[in-house]
């Protein structure tokens, strides 16, 4: 579950072009699917940064209110704990990849968490089946279409 309670955030001086958000309230229940849409600059990216912990752990600014993910305050959790349950896929995900090939990118998260090799192989096989990625395995990420890159980002 994700809950945003009366959150106002304004970016610091290093990011003056972003305006932030004012008095946002949002509840997303387990299993619920939402879409954030709106004009450029309306706060969509800021809301995702609040949920995934990049705000307040990476982006500086002034924040009031609280963001909760699975009953824990995002501001009090290490960002790596929040990243275990929350992820974001950018419109153009090229800047969020850590590897050049698709297979390594998909397994990166499991490797980073120190999961056993056998478990990683099993999860890779299941993910490839579930996302129907067979034709994308072992390919250079930078030779994929935008939609294919987004699929790899979701799978990872």
What does each of the following model-derived ranges do?
Residues 37-39:
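The feature captures the beta-strand-to-loop junction immediately N-terminal to the Walker
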Residues 71, 118-136:
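Conserved ABC ATPase "signature" region
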Residues 1-4, 9-23, 29-30, 55-60, ...:
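A short, flexible loop at the N-terminus of ABC-type nucleotide-binding domains that lies
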Residues 34, 45-58:
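Short, conserved post-Walker A segment of ABC-type ATPase nucleotide-binding domains
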Residues 154-155:
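Hydrophobic anchor residue at the start of the ABC signature
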Residues 52, 94, 100-111, 121, ...:
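Short helical segment in ABC ATPase nucleotide-binding domains corresponding to the A-loop/adjacent helical element
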Residues 140-144, 148:
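Conserved ABC ATPase signature
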Residues 60-72:
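Conserved ABC transporter NBD signature motif
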């Amino acid at each position: 579950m994700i809950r945003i309670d009366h959150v106002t955030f304004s970016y610091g001086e290093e990011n003056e072009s972003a305006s932030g958000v004012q008095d946002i309230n949002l509840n997303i229940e387990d299993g619920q699917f939402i879409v954030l849409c709106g004009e450029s600059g309306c706060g969509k990216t800021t809301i995702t940064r609040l949920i995934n912990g990049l705000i307040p752990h990476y982006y500086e600014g002034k924040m009031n209110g609280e963001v909760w993910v699975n009953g824990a305050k995002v501001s009090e959790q290490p960002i790596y704990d929040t990243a275990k349950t929350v992820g974001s896929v950018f419109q153009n995900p090229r800047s969020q990849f850590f590897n050049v090939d698709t297979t390594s990118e998909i397994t990166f998260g499991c490797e980073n968490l120190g999961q056993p090799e056998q478990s990683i192989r099993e999860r890779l096989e299941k993910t490839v089946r579930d996302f129907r990625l067979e034709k994308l395995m072992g390919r250079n990420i930078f030779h994929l279409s935008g939609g294919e890159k987004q699929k790899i980002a979701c799978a990872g």
